[in-house]
From Swiss-Prot:
The chain crosses the membrane at residues 1825-1845. PANTHER family: FER-1-LIKE (PTHR12546), FER-1-LIKE 6 (C. ELEGANS) (PTHR12546:SF37). SMART domains: C2, FerB, FerI. Residues 37-53, 426-447, 1178-1189, 1226-1245 have a biased composition (Basic and acidic residues). Residues 1190-1200 have a biased composition (Basic residues). The gene is FER1L6. Its cofactor is Ca(2+). This is Fer-1-like protein 6. Residues 1846-1857 are extracellular. Disulfide bonds: none annotated. Residues 448-459, 1113-1129 have a biased composition (Polar residues). One of its GO terms (biological process) is positive regulation of gene expression. It is found in: Membrane.
């Protein structure tokens, strides 16, 4: 279509294929010339592309006629998995609201959990851990939404503050499957205009089986930039605007006509109603919300024209939109089909022009699900709900998705361009369509504006949109599907008793049984036939006859025959006559989408195959894999360039959607970027890459291209091949239509188009256990537009005659059968040599394997090899008289495939299926010279499970006219008539010697209800073997008394063909019976191949005694203590390792220590003076490492300094722990990726540059003045993120541990076979070619024994230190646990039940235990964490196991970690029984090194000289003391730099071990911080154990005096006067201690906001200075039996309130201060400013723990506005001081405060009503009152005067004077 000329397939065709129909080929060329642009005829472009030759080690046939060979015959089905979602809610900040009581709820699916309620704060601190367990298929589980909401808690109806949503898939796709220390942005779903509602700091992790959780350090509690650390994936913008997601549903077609209601079916039966029995509606789900359309009654082709509108922040944290079509039922609705659209595939997150918003369609979505039968009960309903692969087409739906950014802020501009493009109608559609679309858009815009005015919530809206009844009749094109069945074999006997036929369908076309109406063209089969054009044009100018094509989508039913040699399989005799199917379907012409996908997929396939080829080159150690890799990348660049040049032309397509254009641009831009990278790799621009790195980069390219291949907008539905038994569907294969699509341009053609592809049919739905193949079908399929129909037969194997369905049809129809008249006789030789790594099918953990080899209609079986997982058959199976039809050259290029199935033979019952593989035979024709083929491994698969490898090769030999005598001769058979594999095919063997180290067996479980007591190990390889001695009593000593043995065996010279080595352990029982206990098979021996070691001679030449004497002399001369080298030798440390030699002055070497990286970012200031190679210089200014005598004094000095610095905090082991934690955290911050390979520091350089936890002031001084002798440095230890074994290769440097398996292997436990492990074998192997002359063999001692300690019992003192645990799984219903420790070692069990820690998931144990043990009997240490229960048995939370023996004997010296500094006493006292000089002397002796020689200022080992300070000055006496311990310790830390024998020695450390529970295998149940020390009893006794008991929190009392308030806002208004006032009082408490809230008295009627209080609050609390946290111990609720302890930052809350008499008090403002870090107070009320307070920098903040006493003004705020100021004084005293100098609360004794001098207006109305009248009325209005009073008297006088005047006058007149 686009004319990209990647002539891969064409070139091959031209190289030597004989075409059946040359005219068709010519006409195809003509068609191509007519249709394509002139550039398409450029021939040379094809040369850019290399041949698609098969590059796998399996010899496969040429891919010209057949599709690429796939050895995996079945895809695995979707399996349920266990997942654990762990969420830690740390704290919230900036929550919106006033005086809120926030509580956090977490909802995942139907599960809901809730945190505790925090009172009266907008910044609550929780630090609570929640765990959710889910089981289900990954793909569906990852759509679950985690919804975290923060509510304001009320007794009735909590109020939502804000919420946050993210789906599990987004979390799982993060590095380490987790978000760590991130801030979730909270928004109000009810009103999206209100913006941010606060931030919630949390960790979210999603862990599957076997996933390892990477721990991240908790960041400090200081003010961190929240906006820069939001909980969003990398690459997302920090500000996410709101957006509307429109999902427009136009119509659906071809839905299954089914109604789930019984009455509907009854009605149909009686009335004969032919209406569509389906009432469809669509449900769209996104981001945890769901909207549904209206129901269209009785309609299989419904039209909705409705849009579902979601509102979500963009980009969303939920990946998929779920579209589900339902059938409404009277009882319940039934899902018809489900489809998911991944937003990542319809958008691009990149910035700039490259990025585009999610956009989709309008495009059809093809729906798949269960078979379209109209049965009432659907057995496969799960498929319709999206579980598993759909087995049938269930209609299609026309959908459009668009996104509109709502925010009017700056973000809109970023997306506006894309949005406009999205809104524009497609110009490629005709004008009618454009108008309709435009109208729809306008209407939609109008509606959406209306809607936004109506509601701003995130509620889903569903509304109709106006479009013409028909959007635009998309231009349908007719496609022809043609298929020819070449082989149908391996048909299961159960379904082979009825006639078998095959049906091929695409959509509902071709589906004759239950297809329903044909959608698309809406034509009946008859009318469709009439319109068809002649397809196959005569090439010789004959007139083409326009005869319609009948539809033939099903082969003729035929009764199958029984396969020769295997009654379980039947076959259909398609020998000379190959049945064909063909039919026409009608679909929208958007095949350009599939063409682009095919081009990209071919690029990805080619690159992947090339990478595999390079890997093979590396395996067989051939030269120049680098050059090959560069060639591969060059080819990739040329292919990409060809694609880009075509894509940049942006060819005009009909029916192109916005997404089509955007995707095409994205594809070429991505390829352009990849090309640039590939060029950089070829030219090695940035840095020189190794081959492995180049392969890794190329693999990334493949993954990127594969992502682009997947086309979200469907076009032609998938093709289904169904096998019908008596018209009943029994098995199917599903093929993507793009793989079959034809294009005149070779590069755009589907990879299986016009090729014979082998399909293994599978039954629909869940597969039964032990299922095998249903049928093997070889079918040729071709799908393409009718205009290309002349090419349907082009690639068929030549030599056929086309047989038409009816004689009158002419020759222009597709044939109904292909007749291959030519036949040839072949012989197949199956050379079955051996297999390895098979699945265990018997209860004893072994199998009795045999193989069935099936070829065409023949099957043969190998002999059974009993009781093995690595059988060697060495058998040749001969298949004679095989008749193959067709051209002989075609058969040579594309032979039929051989299927090998492996079974386990059982005495009772049928054989058990172990797996299968597919191979292509090597063909040799009669006229070719014979060359013996090479054996190679074929991978075996049992379903999705890897089932081992088969070493075999298959030859297909053409029988010449002279008969079988003309074939290469075979070796004569043995007595049982079994032919061996010919000698010229068998591998070339050499004599090897296998040395075996037998150490012992461990952890043996019961076998057949009896304990193992007398085990023996049997080693077997290549038919030879050796037995160990029998252990006489496993209980007393599980080690073998004879340590080593050897045997000789003939092994292939090619290392890749080496047979497996099997380890079997048997138990000898009474009466000479033996029982197999367990087995282990080593499939790859390469790890045990030993090269002949030349360096052995020099090592033995070294005089082993001389260095010892020298050392001892020099020691006596220089060291007063006399560290003698001849001290007791524990049996350890005897192994050599090659390490690069360091520079002469080793100590400052920059070589890194990967595992030590966490603690070693800086070089040590203390060691810097020692680095100079000065021998006898006087001591420098630097702080000396004190020798033993003065160390007590130095410890005192340390104590003093620390006490001055950190609130009388005594230096102890925890000081070292917190310093190490801080160091580790800083190292991770500097190196966030945590690259272990970082090489900037050494353990000896880090040992001292450490700050103490609580203080920062001195840290800076340490950095600035590293040599300041006034400041001591804390020693630190190494804190490992994982267990110690993972850092030191499991301590398997001297012996390896092999797990012995027993019992059947199942797919469920693959990879985590914990239940099958019956015990462990400890030993090792050394394999090397046998020396030619026997004299050169080692005399006496075997090579493998050199350096191995004796394995007699050793008594050891073991100290186990348990520091803390974190993230334990909750064991109680309330989501907490009461953990305690149980330790088991042999028969010793220590239960620490009394010391359980109540209600805690992150307990600090600080416990140490001492056990005496005897190795090897008691060598497995188990540490279990139990949950303490008052009633019932205690529950196990998790356990971890440590093999102490491996550590004890390891050359890494894991018995006691080397400390960073040498000291005699104090917190860092030397723990080991041997001093550093003694350890060094012993290491040199064991490794036969010359030395150590001690000289002043240096130590010499061989030719290495280590310089450093050895003379120290005693401060008190000014005496000089000589000590070599410090320098010796430094040498030990650099031991890995010693040439040949050096290795890393274990430093003082804490390991973090994961805890597991047997009921949840592979799922972490928490982590444990601990370490183990071991001391042999034959050495001097060690000192007392380290005291790691937890620090007790220190008691403090905070005295807060509230003096005055100013400018408090006035809330009340006088009803008479309108004057504002407030009745002010202040409330205060420490966060977490809300029960101890304290209030001042009320300052009534404050008219200015001023309040006078003179009121004292007293807050006693417990505090840990090192952790800067307050410890709160309280009962969780009234029903709790025990108090729980929690740690929280010490935060003081002060609030100002307005007192109300009749209603609840009014909240006016709050002030929260972290007592560790709060802004300085203002000196006056005027200077007190809210902005200054909130924006105070860390440097200006102060700590009450340093200042002790602070007084000043601080601001109150409400909704981020200043609402008042308070003058307060804070005074911090310790509990002891508070007891000595107590003060009274409020204004009470002792030390009472004076009453405040309040204004006269301050009083209560109720208490003093007259005062109230006086002050509020009389004082303000007295003149008005007086005037009013006078006026009233005057008025009364006047009234009385007027009233009495007439009477008086009349009386006067009458009476007279």
């Amino acid at each position: 279509m686009f004319g990209l000329k990647v002539k891969k397939k064409r070139n091959k065709a031209e190289k030597g294929l004989i075409l059946a129909n040359k005219a068709a080929k010519d006409s195809q060329g003509d068609t191509e010339a007519l249709q394509e642009e002139p550039s398409h005829q450029e021939g040379p472009r094809g040369d850019l592309v290399h041949d698609d030759a098969s590059i796998f080690p399996v010899p496969s046939a040429s891919p010209k006629r057949r599709s690429k060979l796939l050895t995996k015959i079945h895809d695995g089905e979707v399996r349920s998995q266990n997942y654990q979602i762990a969420i830690t809610i740390t704290e919230a900040r900036q929550l919106v609201g006033e005086n809120i009581d926030p509580v956090v709820t977490i909802e995942i699916g139907d599960e809901k959990k809730q945190s505790t309620v925090k009172e009266g704060t907008n910044s609550p601190f929780y630090n609570e851990y929640f765990v959710f367990d889910f089981i289900g298929p990954q793909v569906h589980l990852f759509d679950k939404i985690i919804k975290i909401s923060v509510f304001h808690h009320k007794l009735i109806g909590s109020v939502l503050i804000g919420s946050f949503k993210v789906d599990l898939g987004t979390v799982y796709n993060q590095p380490g499957h987790q978000f760590c220390n991130k801030w979730a942005l909270l928004t109000d779903p009810g009103d999206i205009r209100t913006g941010t509602k606060g931030y919630l700091k949390c960790d979210i992790s999603v862990m599957g089986k076997g996933d390892v959780l990477k721990t991240s350090p908790k960041t400090s509690d200081t003010e961190e930039p929240i906006e820069k650390n939001l909980l969003i994936p990398n690459g997302f913008p920090l500000e996410r605007p709101w957006a509307r997601f429109y999902v427009r549903l136009y119509k659906a077609e071809g839905l299954p006509k089914m109604n789930s209601s019984i009455m509907a079916n009854v009605t149909k039966a009686f009335v004969g109603d032919s209406k569509d029995l389906v009432d469809p509606f669509v449900e769209v789900s996104f981001a945890g919300q769901m909207g549904r359309t209206t129901v269209q009654k009785n309609c299989a082709d419904p039209v909705w024209h409705e849009q579902v509108i979601f509102k979500e922040m963009f980009p969303p944290l939920c990946r998929r939109v779920k579209i589900q079509v339902w059938d409404e039922g009277s009882m319940n609705d039934v899902a018809l089909a489900t489809h998911f659209i991944d937003l990542k595939k319809i958008s691009n997150e990149q910035d700039g022009d490259k990025g585009f918003l999610p956009t989709f369609g309008p495009a059809w979505i093809n729906l798949y699900g269960s078979p379209r039968n109209h049965s009432l009960m659907d057995d496969y309903q799960e498929m319709n709900e999206g579980f598993g692969e759909g087995v049938s087409f269930r209609g299609r739906i026309l959908v459009e998705i668009a996104v509109e950014i709502l925010s009017g802020r700056a973000q809109e501009s970023k997306f506006s361009k894309a949005l406009k493009e999205l809104k524009l109608p497609s110009k490629d559609k005709d004008s009618k369509s454009s108008k309709g679309k435009d109208k729809a858009d306008k209407t939609e815009d109008g509606k959406s504006q209306q809607a936004s005015n109506k509601t701003n919530s995130t509620e889903v809206e569903v509304e109709s949109f106006d479009v013409p009844p028909e959007i635009v009749p998309e231009k349908n094109e007719e496609f022809l599907l043609f298929g020819a069945f070449f082989e149908a074999t391996m048909i299961d006997r159960k379904i082979g008793d009825k006639p078998i036929s095959f049906e091929v369908s695409i959509g509902n076309f071709g589906n004759l049984i239950d297809g329903g109406s044909h959608h698309g063209s809406k034509k009946s089969a008859e009318s469709a036939e009439e319109d068809l054009l002649p397809l196959l044009h005569e090439g010789q100018g004959d007139v083409a006859h326009d005869v319609p094509i009948p539809m033939a989508s099903t082969t003729h039913p035929e009764k199958p025959l029984v396969t020769e040699g295997n009654r379980n399989y039947n076959y259909l005799p398609f020998e000379a006559k190959k049945p064909c199917v063909y039919f026409i379907s009608s679909w929208g012409d958007q095949t350009f989408r599939l063409h682009w996908s095919n081009m990209l997929e071919k690029m990805a396939d080619f690159l992947e195959e090339s990478i595999e080829e390079v890997r093979e080159l590396i395996k067989i150690s051939q030269e120049a894999p680098e050059e090959k890799m560069k060639t591969v990348l060059s080819d990739f660049i040329s292919r990409s360039s060809a694609f880009i040049s075509e894509a940049e032309k942006k060819p005009k397509m009909l029916n192109q959607t916005t997404l089509d254009k955007k995707r095409l641009t994205l594809c070429w831009q991505e390829l352009e970027a990849m090309c640039k990278e590939a060029k950089g790799i070829i030219q090695q621009q940035k840095k020189k890459l190794s081959v492995d790195e180049m392969i890794h980069e190329a693999q990334n390219f493949v993954e990127k291209i594969r992502f682009l291949v997947d086309e979200p907008q469907h076009t032609i539905p998938d093709v289904f091949i169904w096998m019908l038994s008596n018209n009943r569907r029994v098995a199917y294969a599903r093929i993507a239509s793009k793989d079959l699509l034809y294009s005149p341009v070779a590069g755009q053609m589907g990879k299986h188009c016009g090729k014979i592809k082998t399909h293994f049919l599978k039954p629909p739905g869940k597969r039964p256990a032990g299922w095998s193949v249903q049928a093997k079908v070889d079918v040729y399929l071709w799908l393409g537009s009718i205009k290309h129909a002349s090419a349907i037969l082009d690639n068929l194997p030549v030599g056929y005659e086309a047989e038409m369905s009816s004689k009158g049809a002419g020759t222009n129809h597709p044939p109904s059968n292909l007749l291959y008249q030519e036949q040839h006789v072949f012989q197949l030789r199956a050379h079955m040599y051996q297999a390895r790594g098979l699945i265990a099918a018997d209860s004893n953990g072994l199998s009795d394997p045999f193989a069935k080899v099936t070829f065409l209609s023949h099957c043969q079986t190998t002999k059974i090899i009993s009781q093995t997982l690595s059988p060697t058959w060495n058998q040749m199976l001969l298949f004679n008289d095989l008749v193959l039809h067709g051209d002989v050259k075609e058969l040579a290029e594309s032979p039929p495939l051989v299927v090998v199935e492996l079974y386990d033979s059982d005495a009772v019952g049928k054989p058990e299926y172990l797996g299968a593989t597919v191979a292509a035979p090597v063909v040799k024709l009669a006229d070719q010279d014979y060359e013996p083929p090479r054996l190679c491994y074929h991978p075996i698969f049992c379903g999705n499970l890897s089932g081992g490898d088969l070493l075999a090769v298959f030859e297909l030999l053409q029988v010449p006219p002279s008969g079988l005598q003309g074939l290469p001769p075979v070796e004569p058979p043995d007595i049982t008539q079994i032919y061996p594999v010919p000698a010229n095919i068998r591998p070339v063997l050499s004599k090897y010697r296998v040395e075996v180290l037998f150490w012992g067996v461990r952890e043996m479980k019961k076998v057949q209800l009896l304990s193992v007591d007398r085990p023996q190990a049997l080693i077997e390889c290549g038919g030879q073997g050796v037995k160990s001695c029998v252990i006489q009593s496993y209980k007393n000593n599980p080690n073998f008394s004879i340590q080593a043995d050897a045997f000789e065996v003939e092994l292939p010279e090619n290392e890749l063909l080496h047979p497996p080595l099997s380890i079997c352990v048997v138990d000898w029982r009474a009466f000479g019976r033996s029982t197999l206990v367990g087995t282990y098979t080593i499939n790859y021996l390469k790890q045990f191949l030993c090269k002949l070691r030349e360096p052995l001679a020099p090592i033995t030449q070294v005089d082993g005694t001389q260095p010892g004497h020298d050392i001892s002399d020099s020691l006596t001369a220089t060291e007063s203590s006399g560290a003698h080298s001849s001290s007791q030798d524990p049996p350890a440390d005897h192994i050599y390792v090659d390490v690069e030699p360091p520079p002469t002055v080793v100590p400052d070497s920059a070589q890194a220590q990967p595992a030590i990286l966490v603690d070693v970012p800086d070089s040590s200031p203390m060691l810097e003076p020692e680095h100079t190679p000065v021998a006898q210089e006087p001591p420098k200014d630097g702080k000396p490492k004190d020798p033993r005598k003065p160390s007590r004094r130095s410890t005192k000095r340390r104590k003093r300094t620390i006490a001055d610095e950190s609130a009388e905090n005594v230096i102890d082991w925890w000081s070292k722990y917190y310093a190490s934690l801080k160091k580790a955290q800083k190292a991770k911050e500097r190196n966030p990726k945590g690259k272990k390979g970082n090489t900037e520091a050494k353990p000896d350089e880090v040992v001292v540059d450490i700050e103490d936890g609580p203080k920062k002031k001195k840290d800076k001084m340490l950095k600035k003045k590293p040599k300041d002798d006034g400041i001591p440095n804390l020693a630190i230890l190494q804190i490992y993120d994982g267990d110690l074994e993972s850092e030191f290769n499991n301590f398997e440097d001297w012996v390896k541990t092999f797990e012995l398996f027993r019992g059947k292997s199942t797919e469920d436990d693959h990879g985590l076979d914990g239940d099958r492990v019956i015990g462990k074998f400890k030993g090792s192997f050394c394999i090397y070619k046998s020396p030619q002359d026997s004299s050169s063999e080692d005399s006496g001692q075997l090579r493998i024994q050199q350096g191995i300690p004796p394995n007699h019992p050793v008594t050891v003192l073991i100290r186990v230190y348990i520091v803390a645990a974190f993230n334990l799984s909750p064991a109680d219903p309330d989501g907490k646990s009461d953990p305690y420790i149980v330790i088991k070692l042999g028969k010793t069990e220590i239960k620490d039940r009394d010391k359980y820690i109540p209600k805690q998931l992150n307990p600090v144990f600080g416990r140490s235990f001492e056990i005496q043990a005897t190795f090897p009997k008691e060598s497995l240490l188990s540490i279990l964490i139990y949950d303490h229960d008052m009633i019932g048995t205690d529950d196990l939370i998790g356990e971890t196991k440590i093999d102490l023996e491996n550590r004890f004997y390891s050359k890494h010296r894991a018995i006691c970690g080397l400390q960073s500094q040498y000291e005699i006493e104090g917190y860092n006292a030397w723990r080991d029984t041997s001093k550093p000089t003694e350890i060094l002397t012993k290491l040199c002796k064991d490794n036969k090194l010359d030395g150590p020689y001690f000289h002043p200022g240096k130590i010499q080992i061989g030719n290495q000289v280590f310089s450093g300070k050895t003379i120290f000055t005693e401060e008190d006496t000014d005496e000089t003391v000589e000590s070599y311990e410090h320098l010796a310790l430094k040498v030990l830390h650099s031991w890995e730099d010693i040439p040949e024998v050096g290795c890393r020695l274990v430093p003082e450390h804490i390991e973090t071990r994961p805890l597991y529970h047997k009921d949840k295998p592979g799922m972490e149940q928490g982590r444990l911080q601990m370490w183990v020390d071991m001391f042999p009893k034959d050495m001097p006794q060690p000192g007392p154990p380290v005291d790691i008991s937890p620090r007790r929190p220190k008691g403090y009392e905070l005295r807060v005096t509230i003096w005055n308030t100013e400018d408090v806002i006035l809330e009340d208004e006088n009803i008479f006067t309108g004057q504002k006032s407030s009745d002010i009082y202040v409330k205060g408490w420490l966060k977490g201690l809300e029960d101890d809230k304290q209030e001042t008295d009320v300052h009534y009627n404050s008219l200015t906001g001023e309040g006078n209080f003179n009121w004292r609050f007293l807050f006693p609390f417990q505090y840990l200075p090192a952790e800067k946290q307050m410890v709160i111990t309280k009962r969780e609720n009234i029903f709790s039996l025990e108090k729980m302890e929690c740690k929280t930052p010490a935060v003081l809350v002060l609030q100002v309130w307005d007192f109300e008499r009749l209603s609840s008090d009014d909240f006016l403002g709050t002030l929260e201060m972290n007592l560790n870090s709060f802004p300085r107070a203002a000196k006056s009320a005027k200077a007190c400013d809210l902005a200054k307070f909130e924006n105070a920098s860390e440097e200006t903040k102060i700590s009450i723990f340093q200042q002790k006493r602070v007084r000043g003004w601080w601001p109150f705020s409400k909704s981020k506005e200043l609402t008042g100021k308070v003058e307060a004084e804070f005074h911090l005293v310790t509990a002891e001081e508070a007891e000595k100098n107590p003060v009274g609360k409020a204004r009470k004794e002792p030390e009472p405060l004076a009453k405040p001098n309040r204004p006269d207006t301050s009083f209560s109305w109720f208490m003093s009503p007259f005062k109230c009248l006086y002050y509020l009325i009389w004082k303000n209005y007295k003149k008005y009152i007086i005037i009013a009073f006078i006026l009233i008297i005057l008025i009364i006088f006047l009234v009385l005067f007027i009233y009495t005047l007439p009477g008086a006058i009349s009386r006067r007149i009458v009476v007279g004077s």
